[in-house]
Amino acid sequence: MKVLVLFSVLFLTLFSYSSTEAIDEFDSDAEDDMLSLMANEQVRAKACTPRLHDCSHDRHSCCRSELFKDVCTCFYPEGGDNEVCTCQQPKHLKYMEKAADKAKKFGGKIKKWFG
């Protein structure tokens, strides 16, 4: 039984060592590839539509707030026949952002007190 445990520990150690070396070699090549792809992607990135601006040309182009992406909301003004679309933040996401901000500030105060 002791021999079996000893061999299993030895096997796991050698296996983890060999896999980390293979991963390290893969990571260096993969990092270079990803950096070149990200550079190309940043060039292609289009500008986002700010909040309360017209988004009828591209309904998925609204900018992100601190935590969530704004949503393109379309409506018909009273007495109008044409549709108006603007980037807006839904109320429930607005309240969630405010709550997260207050929790973050409260966490900072606690860290000061006990830190």
Swiss-Prot record:
Fetch the InterPro entries from UniProt: Spider_toxin_CSTX_knottin, Spider_toxin_CSTX_Knottin_CS
Q: What is this protein called?
A: Toxin-like structure LSTX-D2
Q: Which UniProt keywords apply?
A: Disulfide bond, Knottin, Secreted, Signal, Toxin
Domain note for this entry?
The presence of a 'disulfide through disulfide knot' structurally defines this protein as a knottin.
Note the pro-peptide positions.
Answer: 23-44
Domain of life, per the record?
A: Eukaryota
Q: Which protein family is it in?
A: Belongs to the neurotoxin 19 (CSTX) family. 01 subfamily.
Identify the tissues in which this protein is expressed: Expressed by the venom gland.
PROSITE patterns named in the record? SPIDER_CSTX
Which cysteines bridge via disulfide bonds?
A: C48-C63, C55-C72, C62-C87, C74-C85
Q: Does the keyword Iron apply?
A: no
List the record's Gene Ontology CC terms alphabetically. Answer: extracellular region
Q: Does the keyword Signal apply?
A: yes
One Pfam family here: Toxin_35
**What is an example of a GO molecular function annotated in this UniProt entry?**
toxin activity
Question: Residue span of the signal peptide, if any?
Answer: 1-22
Compartments, as annotated in UniProt: Secreted
Organism annotation: Lycosa singoriensis (Wolf spider)
